[in-house]
């Protein structure tokens, strides 16, 4: 790949960072809405760090003046340093080394971090990620690349606005972060809220229900900051990112019902059972189980696919099911998370909504109705190897696991 170190870091050399205190510190901040990252960029200006804004630019966009080539690019821009906000930013465009935008971003950030540690061993760099980057796809690999390099991967933050949280999490709002992007805002928020070390929630006073919804979807061990006046840089730099712990919080088989305030109608259901779902009843009751205007995540198992972790997610009005490997491959649950035995098949869905008690009870009833009844378990072995009618959801090959 083209190494961004020479040009970009040479321009950054005169921008002061933190006093040397050992390893170089790298923190990352993500959001779905790029306008929130603009606010964070301004808030960090004048603090003891170099702030780099990363963006993804695609040759097919036809953006005027974006580049001298038609290449897909990772763009690095820095306005902010300990000296304040500079109206004449440092900018570097790096051709994407891969067709995968997140893979390309990871490699570029690793190269920048390597150069920053050589330039300022005890300094601090904060990267504002491109909008709608999924932290779980970026950071585990970045942590591996930085291991033993003199760079400490500090905290990872996700920023969102409570005034738009209900809409972006519970309604279907499509993204267009890159060509062919078919994700919705809710799915990215749900994953990043569970994965991040720090959650920065703006607009909490303007929309208490949105603020409570964020609380319900935030892990108990993730730090919640209430706005831009909070010490974001300090919070990030005092943490060291643990990718394994973050992944375990969002794994379908080890996620937890974190809950939160209920004064403004936000609720969370924690549905769990050792019995499997009945394949035919799951198909017929999927709409009732998904509900409307809800977020849900978790796992289930089927007598027709007894060795497979089946996944369940509802976000942004869309339902998705999938396969997360075998039960033997499930990671250790976070400390204090759930009461299931690691590797033991189970159904566990965490469902969050706002108001609408009838919808909450509908989901609870659907979950109970879909489960195999105890008397049906005697014939559960008869499902193995039989077409369960869900091949279009999971694929026929996963039925053999």
Regions found by a protein language model. Give the residues of each.
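C-terminal accessory "lid"/substrate-recognition subdomains
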Residues: 2-11, 57-61, 158, 164-167, ...
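Nucleotide-state-sensitive switch-loop elements of NTP-binding domains
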Residues: 3-7, 12-15, 24-155, 162-168, ...
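A structural signal for short secondary-structure junctions
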Residues: 20-21, 304-305, 341-345
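A short, charged/proline- and glycine-enriched loop
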Residues: 20-26, 262-265
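Short, conserved charged micro-motifs
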Residues: 36-38, 207-211, 277-281, 357-364
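Short, solvent-exposed amphipathic alpha-helical segments in soluble enzyme
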Residues: 42-47, 142-144, 215-217, 286-290, ...
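Short cationic amphipathic helices and targeting signals
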Residues: 127, 199-200, 267-272, 346-354
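Generic C-terminus detector
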Residues: 340-401
């Amino acid at each position: 790949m083209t190494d961004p170190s020479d040009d970009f870091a040479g321009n950054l050399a005169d921008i002061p960072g933190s006093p040397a205190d050992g390893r170089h510190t790298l923190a990352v901040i993500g959001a779905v809405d790029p306008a929130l990252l603009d606010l964070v960029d301004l808030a960090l200006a004048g603090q003891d760090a170099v702030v780099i804004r990363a963006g993804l630019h695609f040759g097919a966009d036809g953006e005027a003046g974006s580049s001298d080539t038609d290449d897909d690019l990772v763009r690095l821009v820095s306005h902010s340093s300990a000296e304040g906000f500079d109206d004449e930013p440092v900018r570097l465009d790096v051709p994407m080394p891969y067709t995968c935008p997140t893979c390309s971003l990871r490699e570029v950030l690793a190269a920048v971090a390597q150069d920053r540690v050589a330039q300022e061993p005890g300094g601090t760099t904060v990267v504002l990620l491109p909008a709608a980057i999924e932290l779980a796809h970026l950071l585990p690999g970045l942590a591996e690349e930085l291991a033993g390099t003199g760079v400490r991967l500090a905290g990872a933050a996700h920023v969102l606005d409570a005034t738009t949280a209900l809409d972006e999490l519970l309604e279907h709002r499509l993204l267009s972060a890159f060509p062919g992007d078919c994700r919705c805002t809710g799915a990215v928020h749900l994953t990043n809220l569970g994965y991040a070390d720090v959650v920065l929630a703006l607009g909490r006073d303007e929309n208490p229900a949105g603020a409570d919804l964020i609380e319900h979807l935030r892990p108990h061990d993730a730090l919640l900051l209430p706005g831009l006046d909070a010490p974001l840089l300090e919070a990030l730099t005092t943490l060291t990112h643990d990718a394994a712990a973050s992944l375990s919080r969002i794994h379908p088989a080890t996620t937890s019902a974190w809950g939160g305030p209920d004064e403004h109608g936000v609720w969370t259901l924690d549905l769990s059972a050792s019995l499997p779902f009945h394949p035919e009843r799951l198909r017929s009751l999927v709409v009732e189980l998904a509900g409307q205007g809800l977020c849900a995540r978790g796992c289930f198992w089927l007598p027709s696919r007894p060795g497979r972790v089946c996944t369940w997610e509802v976000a942004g009005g869309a339902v998705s099911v999938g396969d997360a490997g075998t039960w033997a491959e499930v990671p250790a649950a976070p400390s204090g998370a759930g009461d299931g035995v690691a590797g033991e098949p189970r159904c566990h869905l965490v469902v969050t909504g706002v108001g609408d008690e009838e919808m909450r009870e509908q989901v609870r009833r659907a979950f109970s109705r879909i489960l195999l009844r105890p008397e049906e378990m005697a014939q559960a072995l008869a499902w193995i190897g039989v077409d369960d009618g869900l091949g279009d959801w999971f694929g026929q090959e996963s039925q053999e696991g």
